[in-house]
UniProtKB/Swiss-Prot annotation:
Gene name of this polypeptide: mtlD
Gene Ontology MF terms in the entry: mannitol-1-phosphate 5-dehydrogenase activity
PROSITE patterns noted in UniProt: MANNITOL_DHGENASE
Gene3D superfamilies according to UniProt: N-(1-d-carboxylethyl)-l-norvaline Dehydrogenase, domain 2 (1.10.1040.10), NAD(P)-binding Rossmann-like Domain (3.40.50.720)
Organism per entry: Salmonella schwarzengrund (strain CVM19633)
Catalytic activity: D-mannitol 1-phosphate + NAD(+) = beta-D-fructose 6-phosphate + NADH + H(+)
Protein name: Mannitol-1-phosphate 5-dehydrogenase
Binding residue positions for NAD(+): 3-14
InterPro entries given in the database record: 6-PGluconate_DH-like_C_sf, 6PGD_dom2, Mannitol_1_phos_5_DH, Mannitol_DH, Mannitol_DH_C, Mannitol_DH_CS, Mannitol_DH_N, NAD(P)-bd_dom_sf
């Protein structure tokens, strides 16, 4: 089996790329970073530090790399069996034209074997969004062939991969936590279902997408925002602060109540899942910076993301949300000289005030009780 993976960054190398290579799949990375491409093609291997209760170093070998903006990547798409991505949500649109060209070439060469594409991004139904971009880049005459031969498979991914401490001297070395979860929608595949250790197949993907979004992502973001306000450097430092931990755990329990109501998750098992995530935040080997985790607050405060979406669920079912509101208020306070969205958020609040700014960013009604609650919490944490 041959696979092409877009995105040779830390998540690409440390998570999805590693799982594919470990499964014996012939793997080629596609990226724009020439330093990483050259290193991969010189060595065809790299080291992954897996850290947790037991630390180990795994070697991923037998890999190649191509530029994601050249002809080589188009040629590869015509022949591989699987395409995966870990490029970040905003980059999906940028790689779509190359994928479209590769699919056209595949059709022209008469390659009718099924191809499956899986976007492994921190977003809801990312592959469906990628499919939209790819279809927009195709001529009408090619769309029916693509619909018939190409599976666009949505997934939920979960593994904390912080920037590597050794990145200064080895561009390929990466550190990851022990925990990983890659859940894919088995109803969207073309051809036979693949058997890849570490890939879990489900016919109820949205339950797992929202479980991860409402728990890991919600908790991670609130830990970062409260941690930044309290002057903590890392996620571990922040979650060991009992006052922060209480709010984070409370917020995950509030979002969890929505999941239990919506999808019928077992309450005891979900409580154990929350505890597992709190344990992951405490991992002493992961130097996960609160500023990195908190960046892009405008996206994280948008209607479909990790703070507002669970809040909307509590409103839908008439459930408590006091800790989620505290997290939203902390996000509104996020400031970072490194992050354009943080600067835009600050300017918007300065211009319009917290009430109108939050309503504009989140889509919530400016005159609603919940916006008033968030503004009160925001003012109380100044």
């Amino acid at each position: 089996m041959k696979a092409l993976h877009f995105g040779a960054g830390n998540i690409g190398r440390g998570f999805i790329g590693k799982l594919l290579a470990d499964a014996g799949i012939q793997l080629t990375f596609a990226d724009v970073n020439q330093v990483v491409l050259d290193a991969l093609n010189a060595r065809h291997s790299y080291q992954v530090h897996v850290v947790g209760e037991n630390e180990q170093v795994d070697t991923v070998s037998g890999v190649n790399a191509v530029s994601s903006i050249g002809d080589d990547v188009v040629d590869l798409i015509a022949h591989v069996d699987l395409i995966t991505t870990a490029v970040g949500p905003v980059v999906l649109e940028r790689i779509a034209p190359a994928i479209a060209k590769g699919l056209v070439k595949r059709k022209a060469q008469g390659v009718d074997a099924p191809l499956n594409i899986i976007a492994c991004e921190n977003m809801v139904r990312g592959t469906t969004q990628l499919k939209g971009h790819v279809m927009n880049a195709l001529a009408d005459g090619d769309k029916a062939w693509v619909e018939q031969h190409v599976g666009f498979v949505d997934s939920a991914v979960d593994r904390i991969v912080p920037p590597s401490a050794s990145a200064t001297h080895d561009p390929l070395e990466v550190t990851v936590e022990t925990f990983s979860e890659w859940i894919v929608d088995k109803t969207q595949f073309k051809g036979a279902l693949p058997t890849i250790p570490g890939m879990e197949l489900t016919d109820n993907l949205m339950a797992f997408v929202e479980r991860k979004l409402f728990t890991l992502n919600t908790g991670h973001a609130i830990t970062a925002y409260l941690g930044k306000l309290a002057g903590h450097q890392t996620i571990r430092d922040a979650i060991l602060d009992e006052s922060i931990r209480a709010v984070v755990k409370g917020a995950m329990e509030e979002s969890g109540a929505v999941l239990i109501k919506r999808y019928g998750f077992d309450a005891d098992k979900h409580a154990a899942y929350i505890q597992k995530i709190l344990g992951r935040f405490e991992n002493p080997y992961l130097k996960d910076d609160v500023e990195r985790v908190g960046r892009q607050p405008l996206r994280k405060l948008s209607a479909g993301d990790r703070l507002i979406k669970p809040l909307l669920g509590t409103l839908e079912y008439g459930l408590p949300h006091v800790n989620l509101v505290k997290g939203i208020a902390a996000a509104m306070h996020f400031r970072s000289e490194e992050d354009p969205q943080a600067q835009e958020l600050a300017a918007l609040i300065d211009e319009k005030g917290p009430q109108a700014a939050l309503a504009q960013i989140s889509g919530l009604d400016a005159n609603s009780d919940v916006v008033a609650e968030a503004v009160n919490a925001y003012n109380a944490t100044k």
